[in-house]
Amino acid sequence: MPSIPVTLPSKPEASHAREVAFIGGIISTPLRLRLLSTVGKVDNRDEIRDFLASRRARISPQQAGLAPGGRRRVPGLRREEVAVLAGVSTDWYTRLEKGHITGVSEDVLNAVARALQLDDAERAHLFDLARAATTGPSPRRVRKVRPGLQRMLDAMTDAPAIIRNGRMDIVAANRLGQAMYWPVYQSRVPAPGRGPRPDTARPQPANIARFQFLDPAGHDFFPDWENAADITVALLRTEAGRDPYNKELTQLIGELSTRSDDFRGRWAQHNVRLHHTGTKAYHHPAIGDLVLDYESMDLHADPGLNLTVYTAAPDTPSHDALRLLASWAATLAQPDQPHDADAQHA
């Protein structure tokens, strides 16, 4: 897919202003500042404002147990109604929605979460935003995927398994996982403003999000592309709330927002989610259709990494397809996995 280079003005001041105007409302303030290379204190007020406003807009008075009242200019609850439901003053909630979240107690955050009917993922995201408002960036360490993790993956011989980081980089996989995600490993999406990556270049991490939004093959690999894309963006949004100072993550979000209308629209919705179990459909170029159950878990001994294992119910076409995938995997050379560059999670 051809790249879409971003032409920047020659003056840094003009560049800054135009980029903010372009990205404003799509990427939160911390991410915007990082993308613009303005090093300094990061303010996440815009992110808090947009998240709370988006959650407030989706709840009708009837859903909240309130009388509908008169005509409304915008959908959803009014700020004063959220304040009543949360048991705080209107002025106080208004300040909170404007991003003044520093020092807010857990009890108050929980009350707001209940008033806005946040699910578990959204509640965790709100607390992540509050935490980011009171803490600064911590030193980041580059870690290799531990040998024990790779041995664990390799011991799983009948099920595809991958380990990814918060950027959606596949940082480790077993043989079946490599075979299943072969199209992602083989993707040659060019970097912004550059041509395709030559085969002699240093291997880059296999990134599910870049493949999904920037490589046309992503639409073939994910038959239910719309739903899969929703999940990917929600996972990235969740990770951005957890780690708003992660330069690699914010660069990825900036790239996808600039180059993909599909990503940009989804990012503006502020949806978040926890990704632990479910069923996904795939169309593998060598094997055909697969419908696989997955179990996903965060690796608490390795913060920032997530293990996902895929299985198929016995006596199903997908179970037979996994056997065929294993036979096909045996014919492949293993793709490069630059672990030392990709497992950044501290």
What are the roles of these predicted feature ranges?
Residues P2-R18, S28:
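Low-acidity, Ser/Thr- and Arg-rich intrinsically disordered low-complexity segments
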Residues Q63-L77, T135-G148, D154-T157:
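An N-terminal domain-cap segment
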Residues I27-A53, V104-R151:
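Short amphipathic recognition helices of helix-turn-helix/homeodomain-type DNA-binding modules
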Residues P147-R167, V171-A346:
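Hydrophobic protein-protein interaction segments
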Residues G70-R73, R79-E80, A86-G103, A113:
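Recognition helix of helix-turn-helix/homeodomain-like DNA-binding domains
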Residues D46, D50-L85:
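Short basic helix-loop element that most often maps to the first helix and adjoining turn
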